[in-house]
Amino acid sequence: MSSGSLGQGISAAVGMAITAKLSGDDYRVYTLVGDGEIQEGQVWEASMLAAHRKLDNLVVIVDNNNLQIDGAITEVNSPYPIDKKFEAFNFHVINIDGNDFDQIDAAFKEAKTVKGQPTAIIAKTVKGKGVSFMENQVGWHGKAPNDEEYKIAMEELEKAGEALCQK
């Protein structure tokens, strides 16, 4: 589902996780939030409820790239340290390099073993990773490349994908 306005995705995910618990279903709910998005109070209200309800079927992935539409997170309204905030809300926290597929895989496997509390995976990422002119550039937030930029980006991503397949 589209999460709508900032902060609403985690609230919907908490509702889905509660529904699974109440209905006796064993599915897991995953939601992705940005480090800019977690400045929204609704995120922390939902997190508090998730921990209170011991939603061990909920995994919150935080895309921690230090950039949001208005600029660097640290210059706009810093939520750091993100991991400590989720720990304070009684989440099991896993810090990873969000651009490392092996670490991502390991984090999801670990999250499945957690009992009695929700999990937050704090994924340190590079915005625009793999495209030289987009990496760590806040100006690409919500902006589409032109035809030439698209061609260059796809060539760079294809090379990166080939390198991953050879790993």
Sequence positions of predicted segments:
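Glycine-rich ThDP/TPP pyrophosphate-binding loop and its adjacent helix/strand module
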Residues: M1-K167
